[in-house]
Amino acid sequence: MEDVQNSPAQVAMPIDRVGVKNLQLPLVVSDRAQGRQHTVATVDIGVDLPAHFKGTHMSRFVEALENWTEELDYASMKRLLEDVKTRLEARKAYVLFRFPYFIRKKAPATGSPGLVCYQCRLTGELEEGRPSFLLEVEVPVMTVCPCSKAISDEGAHSQRAVVRIAVRMTRFSWLEEFIDLAEVSGSSPVYTLLKREDEKFVTEDAFAHPTFVEDVVRAAAQRLERHPQISWFRVEVESFESIHCHNAFASIERTITPETQPGS
């Protein structure tokens, strides 16, 4: 049969990335408490394409994923990237896994358990044999406005916010490390199941620790700077303001070197 993909391109221009998007697959990820967690991932996968080829071989991306049945970590992701690069005879390979990750959290007063969902992304790229990985996680928190608390006779406005962390690491780290780091940076964590005693605890604890988005992003960034496995990070905090018709945000991005490591 004629291989149209390998025929000459009408416009001889190289393509940076071509492949398939939004392919859903079951996924196994490392879980600090349980060892392993089964979830569902939405996958984007692609390669570069030289100027002289009309098209890529889309079926080979799916074949590579079908043959990849490993637990998601850096080593297994590198093997997947190498397989894709070989199958497509490419110089560069790319894969992105988007998946929900669940942690069963106990309410602070009653201990009632409830699952909290965190949206995660792991991106891998391979070029000239060198892999690079980017881990991202979104963590909901609660914030209480310090200004509102200071100027009001009673109460203060509070709202949910999200801490978005992206890191490049030199070795494996648990997702829970970054989730914990984000949650302690806000006024309070948020929970799925709260009884009245828990609501009282969360409200009083949050009002005892009021935070601007600036406070939250600085606290998270300071903790990320101290992480021994991080070479680069970006953290953004977005607050869904309860008394404004807009959101507030703050972000910090840093490259970590031995010279910039705290205590060096």
UniProtKB/Swiss-Prot annotation:
It catalyses: GTP + H2O = 7,8-dihydroneopterin 3'-triphosphate + formate + H(+). It comes from Nitratidesulfovibrio vulgaris (strain DP4). It comes from the Bacteria. InterPro entries: GTP_cyclohydrolase_FolE2 (IPR022838), GTP_cyclohydrolase_FolE2/MptA (IPR003801). NCBIfam families: PRK13674.1-1. Converts GTP to 7,8-dihydroneopterin triphosphate. One of its GO terms (biological process) is tetrahydrofolate biosynthetic process. Its EC number is 3.5.4.16. The keyword Zinc-finger does not apply. The record marks C145 as: May be catalytically important. Keywords: Hydrolase. It is an enzyme of class 3 (hydrolase). Belongs to the GTP cyclohydrolase IV family. Disulfide bonds: none annotated. The keyword Hydrolase applies. This is GTP cyclohydrolase FolE2. Pathway: Cofactor biosynthesis; 7,8-dihydroneopterin triphosphate biosynthesis; 7,8-dihydroneopterin triphosphate from GTP: step 1/1. Gene3D superfamilies: Urate Oxidase. One of its GO terms (molecular function) is GTP cyclohydrolase I activity.
